[in-house]
Amino acid sequence: MARRTWPILDPALFVGSLVVYFAGTPLGLDRVAAASGVAASLGATSPEPGTRLALLVLRLGALFPLGELAARANLGAAVLAALATALLGRLCADLLAAFRPPAHARQGPRDFLHEPFLAAGAALAGGLSLAVFQTGTSAGAASATLALLAGAWLAALPILRAAGRARHGFALAGLSGLAAGVDPVAGPLLWPLAFGLWLWELRRGQRWPLWAPLLFVAALGGSTLASVAPAGNPVDLRHLLAGLWPAGIHDHLALVGTAAELCDELGVVGSLLAGLGTLALLRRAPLVAFWFGFTVVTALLLGYWPAQSGLHFEATRAGLPAALMAAAVPMSAGAAELAARLGRARMVAAIVLAGLAVVSPVLDGGTSRWRRDVHGPERLLEHALLRAPLRASVDPGTAEMDGLLRYGAVLGLRPDLEIVRRK
């Protein structure tokens, strides 16, 4: 088994990013649309199609012995976001290690000391960008989607470089099946590319593709069963297969706006490094360049910029964050390409480039990322409950209010009210 390069990078990124995420995690609901998922996680309401991964994340967050239900759900999302950042850093480090000169070249271990700085800088630039930070510290499935994607990318990298083993193929098949079973963003981003790799490896005469479909189907069925079984309500085929195709692809105008938001959050330096890295990957690893290029474009087609809110956007809320995380991979390759041209100054250049790549995403949004309004949903719920008469039947009117009222019922507020189920 190949030795892992820079093993200290993974725990350092996880702990460091987790501290930052915890510092920005709100202690309550920061948006009304999250109330529906929190209520559904305890069986108070039926899950919507495409929200099953959110239910699994919220049930995981409910295990935290800190704060109320919403705060625990936010903390669970923060842990998964930190895991995604650590996996992304490991992916960038492995990619840079794959681009090293041959073993007989006149270079020693000291000539590669700049790699962990570039990998950590790219991972933090993606993980601490505004969209990733906001979605990763709030209740929902976005952080789990990012962790799922990062794990699948890490498993796919050796296969893309024609150096994969059976364990990499099995991991990719299992994660793709899990994504297709529960996630309408990670599913369309993974299983088409995984299917292409499966055909390619099968044509090369590898044996693991013969067993991969069984693992894919088992992961798809198991994840779907785990997410819908606690609800106790019958589900149709559209609900079960919601993760196999996109929840909705928007038009070209929304795509341009989302792409502009992507470049704005990465910053000028990050965007230039990502472009340079894409050219370098096209020359040295075209399959890797195609994989992440497809991921970025498809994620932009599925996602929306952070200004969009509401229950309608919950299923594809991780689209823009997934594009930001995927763009961090060519960013690390571009920074390494630029630093390598400076000879002995590459160590200093790597530190400077990593710092410049992180500064713009971290400063984006100013203090708003640390001061999330958790009073709006609470005041709306309090106002709705105060206006309701005793022992009344309440018609929520909208899906957002339905989730908010059922969230209040989970907390034990106004048990005398009967909430009319929306059809």
Predicted regions and their residues:
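Loop-to-helix entry region of an early transmembrane alpha helix in multi-pass inner-membrane enzymes
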Residues: 66-90, 108-112, 116, 120, ...
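Membrane-interface transmembrane helices that cradle and orient dolichyl/undecaprenyl
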Residues: 112-113, 136, 149-171, 178-179, ...
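Perimembrane helix-loop-helix junctions
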Residues: 188-218
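Signature aromatic-anchored transmembrane alpha helix within multi-pass, membrane-resident enzymes
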Residues: 282, 333-363
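Hydrophobic, aromatic-rich transmembrane alpha-helices
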Residues: 266-288
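Short hydrophobic/aromatic helix or loop-helix immediately within or flanking a transmembrane segment
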Residues: 44-71, 75-79, 179
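Transmembrane-helix signature of polytopic, membrane-embedded enzymes
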Residues: 88-128, 146, 167, 343-354
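Transmembrane-helix motifs of polytopic, lipid-linked glycan transferases
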Residues: 75-111, 148-158, 329-333
